[in-house]
Amino acid sequence: VYDTVEEAVDREDADASVVFVPPAFAGDAVFEALDTDLDLVVAITEGIPTQDMAKVNKRLSEVDTRLIGPNCPGIITPGEAKLGILPGNIFESGDVGLVSRSGTLTYQVVSNLTDRGIGQTTAIGIGGDPIIGTSFVDALKAFEADVDTHAVVMCGEIGGEDEERAARY
């Protein structure tokens, strides 16, 4: 256990961070992770203040780090890696990507896919808060660049403009 993200990166050569802190402190925790040039930050915390997330998104435009979340279950590539709270036992390696704003729908869809013998390359819960770091289009672009992903399942929420942008993409 380390006192700072920077110390963990220096000692363990970490390239990702998962944020599990109360909403009032989560913005600062994300900033701390962004300041260490990690490849990926996953913010599980729900309800990070909107002003904090607006500042985080401004900072994201200045760095090469991808933020998944907040208010998300995380990301998993079955059999390889998991960051977050996704129940790994329901996933099976395969060729279908999944991107969702809802953790519960993610679990249901993955369970249905796996039960039918359809495995997943990666599943990404992008988060349900008003301001998130990775959009549906960002996720679709990542899946498009992945030679192992042959199809993508997308689970949105009612009234979302991000879902409409993804449909146009």
Language-model segment annotations:
Residues 1-169:
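Catalytic-core regions of core metabolic enzymes
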